[in-house]
Amino acid sequence: MATGVLPVFVGRATRGVEFFEHAEKTYETELLLGVATDTEDTTGTVLFRREVSVTPGQLTAVLERFRGEIMQIPPMYSALKVNGQKLCDLARKGRQVERQPRPVTIHELTLLSREGDTLRLRVRCSKGTYIRTLCADIGEALGCGGCMQALRRTQAGEYTIAEAVPLQQLLESPEPETYLRDVDTMFRGYPGVKLTANQEKRCRNGNAFSVPLPGGTYRAYSQSGEFLMLAKVEDGVMSTIKSFFDVQ
């Protein structure tokens, strides 16, 4: 059902997990119209089937409604917790819990193809977006219902499917470490800057220091090229967002 990019963090790089969790994700998904299930995908129990009579114009209009910031109710079959219990565990016991709508942002929603009652969509979205729920909501808005029948994550943060390594290939490799990426690659969207020896010393001590740079977020490196930290500059002063150097 679900395949695609899954970055794995090891060693000191685990300090970057919190940034990855907030990164945008891109998916390609298949939406099956005319079928609704309790899990909002084709693995669940069918709730109803309806005839599909959706015109291209209707589809275009409905998809437009789901672009930008939207409100989404998390599905019961999810790992979210209510009073310490996962919603999916409650759902398996036949219990329903009221869930409050949450804002999510759909940066891109593109119809890639349509074959019969199956739509193939590309979705670029914010953290916390449930693609299953998006599919179900689109189906409901079209008046015929719908559920997700396939999902592939094609990009997670700065990492794309083209860079991904199949698990079996990784397990069988005699030198799996060759597939490792430096943690600073996840911040390549930010400009990099080399620190002076004195600035590096202050950085390693956790102190802020003056820099002749405009405000913003930066990748900071030592003179030898070691990635030291993700940093922010405000009013000509650089300070640490998160350090990545090894502590001696």
PLM regions with names:
Residues 1-163, 229-230, 237-239:
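RNA pseudouridine synthases
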Residues 3-5, 23, 57, 63, ...:
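Accessory RNA 3′-end/elbow-binding domains used by RNA modification enzymes
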